[in-house]
């Protein structure tokens, strides 16, 4: 794990649906205020129908909304890569989430809330999402009944959905059709059961008294009950409507616009054979991109350290050139500056490239220890040097301070 690169606080439909339903009520401004109140300056907020994710530069902190998950650095980056690739979605490989990741990053960037680390992480995540889809075609085959139903509705249906039933299968399907993308009405025979079920997802609810009227007012009719007799008769199969029957025995009499549970099982079996191979391919791609991204992050961290040293070198360069010019006014100042700049770059290039090369062979935890020890003492030494030169203090104090710090390290 690298030091304070990115922290992620998240709620999502899979890990704790109840707390997620409370968190998703709040919009972008609410979460940005939470981050601002905790002194966070750089962040990206990803809000979708299925997740609330706060990526930010800073230490973990507690938030009022409970049930959240909190991870940091390489774990957070790995999670983002899986999200962008569609591996953490209800519908594996879906394209919409990649668009949402891109929009979240662009919004943060346009507001000045993204720095070079967040930019690197999100740009790489977007690239990973595109790469996984182009190399594996992972979004083309779903396995679970709810995800297959969701795919069918997304491709062929409208946005007004009648869900008949409030049992286990209905509860697995319900989270897929969140507001505002879909308007869902839950129907059943027991008003108390239907109300309790619908209120979990903030859906509308009705008694199933006039099925024809309910069918007329919706685009998609999904039945998932244990009724022993059909709920929808053949005469009620209105043209232009999509019927999905998940009942066993069947809830809907057969018709041309009825998709049955057996048909969905066949889709699932076919896709299951392809899915495992595609997920494995995607994981390999993500692992490779993670290694490349971690190395780039290490480079940025090392560059940050040496940028302070370059600043020190620039101060020394300016002052020494001024001294030299007093003794040799005939020398062209621009040529002298170019020469000095070239010498500094060539000298500092050796430790920079060496440290970057060493970091490639270090695990993240080993690099962390090395970096923390090196950067702490190095920054103290350079800060003392800068103060000495910029303040024109006695260079003897600089030598003494440097010697003490080196002995301490």
From Swiss-Prot:
InterPro entries: 4pyrrol_synth_GluRdtase, 4pyrrol_synth_GluRdtase_dimer, 4pyrrol_synth_GluRdtase_N, GluRdtase_CS, GluRdtase_dimer_dom_sf, GluRdtase_N_sf, NAD(P)-bd_dom_sf, Shikm_DH/Glu-tRNA_Rdtase. Its EC number is 1.2.1.70. Pfam families: GlutR_dimer, GlutR_N, Shikimate_DH. GO terms for molecular function: glutamyl-tRNA reductase activity; NADP binding. Belongs to the glutamyl-tRNA reductase family. Catalyzes the NADPH-dependent reduction of glutamyl-tRNA(Glu) to glutamate 1-semialdehyde (GSA). PANTHER family: GLUTAMYL-TRNA REDUCTASE. Possesses an unusual extended V-shaped dimeric structure with each monomer consisting of three distinct domains arranged along a curved 'spinal' alpha-helix. The N-terminal catalytic domain specifically recognizes the glutamate moiety of the substrate. The second domain is the NADPH-binding domain, and the third C-terminal domain is responsible for dimerization. This is Glutamyl-tRNA reductase. The gene is hemA.
């Amino acid at each position: 794990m690298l030091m304070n690169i990115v922290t992620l606080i998240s709620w999502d439909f899979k890990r704790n649906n109840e707390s997620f339903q409370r968190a998703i009520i709040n919009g972008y401004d609410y979460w940005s205020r939470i981050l601002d109140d905790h002194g966070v300056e750089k962040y990206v907020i990803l809000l979708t129908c299925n997740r609330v994710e706060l990526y930010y530069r800073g230490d973990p902190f507690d938030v009022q909304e409970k049930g959240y998950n909190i991870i940091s650095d390489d774990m957070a980056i790995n999670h983002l890569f899986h999200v962008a690739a569609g591996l953490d979605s209800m519908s594996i490989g879906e394209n919409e989430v990649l668009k949402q990741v891109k929009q979240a990053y662009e919004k943060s960037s346009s507001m000045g809330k993204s720095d070079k680390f967040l930019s690197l992480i999100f740009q790489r995540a977007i690239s990973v999402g595109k790469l996984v889809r182009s190399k594996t075609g992972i979004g083309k085959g779903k396995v679970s009944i709810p995800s297959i139903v969701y795919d069918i509705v997304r491709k062929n249906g409208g946005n007004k959905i009648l869900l008949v039933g409030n049992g286990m299968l209905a509860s697995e399907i319900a989270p897929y059709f969140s507001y505002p993308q879909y308007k869902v009405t839950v129907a059943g025979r027991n008003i108390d059961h239907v109300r309790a079920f619908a209120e979990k997802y903030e859906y509308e609810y009705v008694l199933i008294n006039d099925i024809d009227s309910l069918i007329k007012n919706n685009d998609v009719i999904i039945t998932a009950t244990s009724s022993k007799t059909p709920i929808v008769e053949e005469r009620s199969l209105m043209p232009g409507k999509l019927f999905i029957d998940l009942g066993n025995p069947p809830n809907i009499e057969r018709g041309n616009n009825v998709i049955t549970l057996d048909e969905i099982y066949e889709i699932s079996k076919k896709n299951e054979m392809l899915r495992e191979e595609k997920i494995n391919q995607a994981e390999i791609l993500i692992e490779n991109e993670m290694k490349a991204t971690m190395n780039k992050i290490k480079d940025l961290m090392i560059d940050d350290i040496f940028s302070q040293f370059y600043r020190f070198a620039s101060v020394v360069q300016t002052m020494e050139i001024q001294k030299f010019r007093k003794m040799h006014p005939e020398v062209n100042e621009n040529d002298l500056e170019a020469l000095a700049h070239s010498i500094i770059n060539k000298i500092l290039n050796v430790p920079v490239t060496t440290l970057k090369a060493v970091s490639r062979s270090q695990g993240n935890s080993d690099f962390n220890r090395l970096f923390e020890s090196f950067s702490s003492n190095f920054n103290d030494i350079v800060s003392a040097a800068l103060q000495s030169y910029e303040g024109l203090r006695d260079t003897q104090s600089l030598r003494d301070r440097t010697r003490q710090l080196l002995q301490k390290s």
